[in-house]
């Protein structure tokens, strides 16, 4: 993927271990520190070495403002080795024979809120997915807390919520 620029942001692939370390640092800030979890937790996992890491940087300060990773699965390659498969039964998704990719660890720096960050990130994702011929994109997401009512609108968009009849 060629770097993608919009306004003051650039999205590009990580090219070396230092880039991946920067992504891991932002992930730690977003998923551990910002949520007041144990600072000793690392956000690195065994999947990182098998993924493309995409960085979105502010061109004025070189600050890493967003990152995510993609793990590609070629045609007929089972997705049972994906991050998501650790937590969910993906057997029905495995029936899809085309190229697949798992989107993971998507985060935006907690101190940055410019919508162009998301636009550049999704633009880069689209470029990569289209360029690789990916037919099916999947992944996990994290929600703060355990109260699903806070996220009812988001859940309804991907999985219709049926109301139970009053007894």
Per-range role (PLM):
Residues 51, 66-67, 107, 140:
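Generic recognition of cysteine residues
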């Amino acid at each position: 993927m060629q770097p993608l620029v919009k306004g003051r942001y650039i999205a590009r692939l990580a090219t070396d271990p230092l880039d991946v370390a920067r992504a891991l640092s932002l992930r730690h800030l977003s998923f551990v520190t910002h949520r007041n979890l144990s600072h000793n937790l690392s956000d690195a996992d065994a999947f990182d070495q098998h993924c493309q890491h995409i960085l979105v940087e502010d061109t004025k300060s070189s600050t890493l403002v967003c990152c995510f990773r993609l793990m590609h699965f070629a045609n007929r390659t089972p997705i049972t080795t994906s991050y998501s498969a650790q937590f969910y039964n993906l057997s029905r998704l495995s029936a899809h024979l085309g190229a697949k990719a798992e989107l993971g660890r998507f985060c935006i720096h907690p101190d940055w809120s410019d919508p162009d960050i998301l636009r550049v990130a999704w633009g880069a994702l689209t470029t990569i997915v289209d360029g690789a011929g990916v037919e099916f994109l999947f992944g996990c997401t994290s929600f703060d807390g355990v109260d699903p009512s806070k996220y009812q609108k988001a859940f309804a968009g991907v999985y219709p919520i049926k109301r139970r009849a009053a007894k």
